[in-house]
Amino acid sequence: MRSWKVIFPGSLYSKLKDFLFSSSPKENGCFLMANHYKAGPTKSVLIVTKVILPTHNSWQHAGESSLVPTSEFINKAVIEADVTGLCPIFVHTHPSSHHPPSFSSVDQSTNFRLFQNLNEILSTRPLGSIVISRRGITGVVFSDGRLEEILQVTAAGLELKNVQVPQMNDTSSRLNSKFDRQVRIYGEEIQRLIQRMTVSIVGLGGTGSSVAVQLTRIGVGKLILIDKDSIEETNLTRVYGSRLTDVGKTKVEVIKKHLRSFSRSTKVEALQKDVTKDDVLDKLLQSDVIFGCTDNLSSRAILNDVSIQYYIPLIDTGCRIHKLPNGKIDQIVAKIQVVTPDTACLWCTDSLDGVAILQETLPEEERRKLELEGYRESTDKQPSIISLTSIAASLGVNKLLQMITDSTTDSRTEIELSIPIFISDRPKIKQGCICQKRRGIAGLRKVT
């Protein structure tokens, strides 16, 4: 049987809760519209893109212990779902409860009638019902003729909230004593959240390998490592865990072996694949967060699309060292940018260049010709050093920790070491950017 995850844009979830509890002590509710996708053989995801608010005549009954929608309100949701191809989710509150929520007998009767009515027209898509109290959230999905549990609810914004679902909060699970120092900082529940996370890292060079080591040491539950390349001699100065005897071996396997040498608690999956050519989308969709650690613009554009279409936060990390013609270094930069449903994407901040991406796809001979003619800057063998790639990796990992502890407001951080200067800001979503059309559309557009 499948389990389900529901992802809200962080800002939408915050506004939704404010609205739902505004009628307290009476129950309140609405319909949500969501796209859905599979995130592995036994897990599916609903991503909320729209809210249908009630009017004064949307309830057959609204009291402190029950809430029943009218047939008209249900029909309104059916029509919206039928026209848009989205999945309807009925959500309501138990505002007076100070316990983790569960469906009452009235709720169960409402769910039965709701699913029966919706299924007559929307039989090929999942149908959901959620109840929220001040102590958490629970829900079910009716799909393929059976009820399945919602086991995870995430509000994906700069604050990456994992909303409490009763089945997920196993407070009896014992934490390994090796995490004592960080538990003293963040507390036991945050450590348990870290240990439940699945994180993909695309690009396992100096930055990506450092990210992998740091995430493993803080106890992330599973890492998915993706890189097509093998260790070269010049990688030995930057790639964590690499040795002289590793030259010629795949980066992902070398780093996986290194991670296993100091931790057995983090599961590691190593994929020697090219994110621009190989089908790795199904693996990326299993992630709670994606780290982009590649300087290839084509792969960064793909990860940007995955993030905005599927509501999976992306932490894009990078370094840049620029030298003048006379050999003097005039720029040493480590930077990260977080892409979420609520923040600017990489196109918004001009971190991506359409012409440069097109040039990357050209045959090598044509790329070399453009470089010789001065129409393209060579991206081969760019200067790099472990001290800088490690700074970028640490910025990214610290940003993730800030996101899950609700302690960040900025989506972009940049350190210019040659001046030096530290910049932290939240760029605005650019008017007319393609991300506004692609947010939350999931598989309706192929990621290319």
Feature names for model-found ranges:
Residues 115-121, 133-146, 164-170, 175, ...:
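Glycine-rich phosphate/adenylate-binding loop
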Residues 220-263:
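Glycine-rich phosphate-binding loop and adjoining beta1-alpha1-beta2 segment
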Residues 113, 171-199, 231-245, 264-266:
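Short acidic, glycine/proline-enriched helix-loop-strand junctions
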Residues 1-89, 95-166:
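Conserved beta-strand-loop surface patch within small alpha/beta domains used
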Residues 124-127, 266, 310-312:
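A short helix->loop->beta-strand "cap" motif at the edges of active sites that frequently abuts
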Residues 248, 252-289, 294-301:
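A structured beta-alpha segment of the ubiquitous adenosine-cofactor-binding alpha/beta core
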Residues 187-232:
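Glycine-rich adenosine-cofactor-binding loop
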